[in-house]
Amino acid sequence: MKRSLGAKPLLFPTPVLVVGTYDDQGRPNAMTAAWGGICCSKPPCVTVSLRKATYTYASLMARKAYTLHVTDEPHLTASDFLGMASGRDGDKLGTLGLTTVRSELVDAPIIQEYPLVLECKIVHVHDLGLHTMFVGEVQDIKADARVLDEKGHLLLDALKPLGFMPEVRTYHGMGPALGRAFDAGKLHMPKKAE
């Protein structure tokens, strides 16, 4: 018998995303967020949800853009720090020795050391309660060559992305592929009459 866990945001794993913005002084800043993901295929859109109290919130409202960096295993501690410290208190990226370049497509920084980044223009803002959801239309995705195959597809084994388990606050790696989507379930499809 199943046990009730109550009403709470428990879907997992959530991606470990680093949101890049420029603050009101034009300085690059970044924070880690776990509330985010894909929300639309055409146009390609992703979301990230933040509390109004965060330093990044005002930057998103002012700049109408963000970059979304996918955290990989080598950047676990850096991403965790970016979620713990506030840009109000100092240069978090400088503390970590991370370098940025200005996106050519949106008014937000790209952190060079992260292997995968989505450049997003904010197209919708939804105040949901404690969090505000920022829907970003993806303008482009930049990826290091080492995480791509010869056709330009992402190699998860090379990327080594992290997932986050919200309830127990733990980071997890990704395992090997277990099957192909829209293929593994074919054995349950009814046979077509000949």
UniProtKB/Swiss-Prot annotation:
Cofactor: FMN
GO molecular function term, any single one: FMN binding
Secretion signal, residue range per the UniProt entry: none
Keywords from the named record: Flavoprotein, FMN
Protein name: Flavoredoxin
Subunit organization: Homodimer.
Biological function: Participates in the reduction of hydrogensulfite from hydrogen.
Keyword Cell division: no
Family as reported in the entry's similarity comment: Belongs to the flavoredoxin family.
